[in-house]
Amino acid sequence: MDLSDIRREYIHGGLRRKDLQANPIDQFNLWLQQAIDANLSDPTAMTVATVDEHGQPFQRIVLLKNVDDAGFVFYTNLGSRKAQHIAHNNKISLHFPWHPLERQVHITGVAEKLTAMENMKYFMSRPKESQIAAIASHQSSRISARGVLEGKYLELKQKFANGEIPVPSFWGGYRIRPESLEFWQGGEHRLHDRFLYSRQDDNWTVDRLAP
């Protein structure tokens, strides 16, 4: 399939250094809020890239659940493939694509596990159905049929019908402490604007990159 004729112009305007926030987390929050305000589908969806012990990269879509100066937080099954990769190599890449705004953000950083208290606080805030699903699914393991998963879900739903659901030991979150953040804004004639924030000790440097 030849896709060479699929192209479009970027029309939403550029990004200038004078428009940037000094702190990249502030810049990220500004863009994220604009994506939310624009009613984009799944504005908190991000690609999480990890590498296995053989150097093979893997990607998957995960939802961002918190962001602050400490980093970017997501939750997962601690026995999942991504968790196994992180245990081997905790360097991670995140990518947020906000296509309608002609923007994307690329983040590199180091993953660290959240505390048991942080895990419990978020787990208890989830809908009960989501809590049950977290226990029913041993993520990335092989199953013979969908019915096996659905049967386990219904079994647990009945078991916890009238009680509190405990946080499973194999479920938790990670915080990605950022080392770099790149902000990309589409530009006319493919002259896109790219700014890279790089951590230098407790400060950030900002460089413009060629598109």
UniProtKB/Swiss-Prot annotation:
A GO MF label: pyridoxamine phosphate oxidase activity
Catalytic activity: pyridoxamine 5'-phosphate + O2 + H2O = pyridoxal 5'-phosphate + H2O2 + NH4(+); pyridoxine 5'-phosphate + O2 = pyridoxal 5'-phosphate + H2O2
UniProt pathway annotation: Cofactor metabolism; pyridoxal 5'-phosphate salvage; pyridoxal 5'-phosphate from pyridoxamine 5'-phosphate: step 1/1; Cofactor metabolism; pyridoxal 5'-phosphate salvage; pyridoxal 5'-phosphate from pyridoxine 5'-phosphate: step 1/1
Residues holding substrate: R7, R8, E9, Y10, K65, Y122, R126, S130, R190, L191, H192
Keyword Kinase set for record: no
Stretch forming the signal peptide: none
Cofactor note: Binds 1 FMN per subunit.
Cofactor annotation: FMN
Pfam families: PNP_phzG_C (PF10590), PNPOx_N (PF01243)
InterPro entries: Pyridox_Oxase, Pyridox_Oxase_CS, Pyridox_Oxase_N, Pyridoxamine_oxidase_dimer_C, Split_barrel_FMN-bd
SUPFAM superfamilies registered for this protein in UniProt: FMN-binding split barrel
Residues involved in FMN binding: 60-65, 75-76, 81-82, 104, 139-140, 184, 194
Catalytic activity, EC: 1.4.3.5
A single GO BP: pyridoxine biosynthetic process
UniProt keywords, alphabetically: Flavoprotein, FMN, Oxidoreductase, Pyridoxine biosynthesis
Subunit text: Homodimer.
Family: Belongs to the pyridoxamine 5'-phosphate oxidase family.
Function recorded in the entry: Catalyzes the oxidation of either pyridoxine 5'-phosphate (PNP) or pyridoxamine 5'-phosphate (PMP) into pyridoxal 5'-phosphate (PLP).
HAMAP family: PdxH (MF_01629)
Protein name: Pyridoxine/pyridoxamine 5'-phosphate oxidase
Gene that encodes it: pdxH
